[in-house]
Amino acid sequence: MALADDNFYPVALADLAMAERQHNVARLEQLRALRAERFELMERLAQLPPDMVFFTQITMEAAEDVAFLDAMRRANIKGALVGVEAVTPEGLKDVYKGFNDVGEALVTRLRTFRDHGVGVLGSFIFGLPSDRSSTFAATADIADRAGLAFAQFVMLTPYPGTVDFAAWEKSLGNNAARIGDIPVTRHWLIPQEKRPKVYAPHPVMSPDEIRARTQAVWDHFYSLRRIWVRSRVTPTIRARIAFVLLSKLYRQMYANTGIATDSARVNRANRWARLIARPCRYLFTARPLPDLQLPAAEGGAGVRARA
């Protein structure tokens, strides 16, 4: 099950420390109450059957808070999406995350999640203005050494409402290419079968070069040998097989269909994804729980869950 929260870790230790330094009592009490609510939620999740598994999204700062990570493990929150975005100081500045770690410090921080029983789906962006050909290999190396369970490597795409989109649209002006009567600056209005892949322009690399190098990183990370090594975090052979199939499915769904521009390759990837999804569904089917009780808050009574 996915805990639908764009940041499951709402109060960082740094936030608490800042409120204390500022002697902001009201803010400190507010943060502590919010933090306590999240711990209470995890205590209640921990009362559910052990085959109920949860996933969520979290910020890198959570690695500093091992008490929170341990509570996640007890709550059976097996994994979290973490937006790493970039592995170089220049790349982090491009995405306004200059406060994040790079190099060995980044590897250590990401490993902290795994060491406390929380698998990480790391998200990386390629095509940032500061990216160079060496960035791709450096990113693949970090993803390998950081002990990530899964990773996604996306190409920088200008989406409406973002600073990148506004700059891209302004740079094209009235010269934007058109598909039919629709400019590519409104690419979401173009029929799916005619819609081009739209990526932010790069100062030194072409879209084709970025696409090819991005695909190579996907191929590297999701090679069968590397997937099998990563699957050792699972407790049983059934779980290892499920991990391998899920990894291959993830790659087919997001790399081959999301990056490829050749329609034949996309169709091939879709067929493979459907084939892999069938055994995945069987392996991930849980036993029925007709008498499942919703965990009670402290001092309360449990409530029977509705089917």
Where are these regions (language model features)?
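Membrane-proximal basic amphipathic "stem/tether" segments
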Residues: 12-29, 225-307
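Catalytic P-loop NTPase motifs of RecA-like helicase/translocase cores
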Residues: 10-11, 90
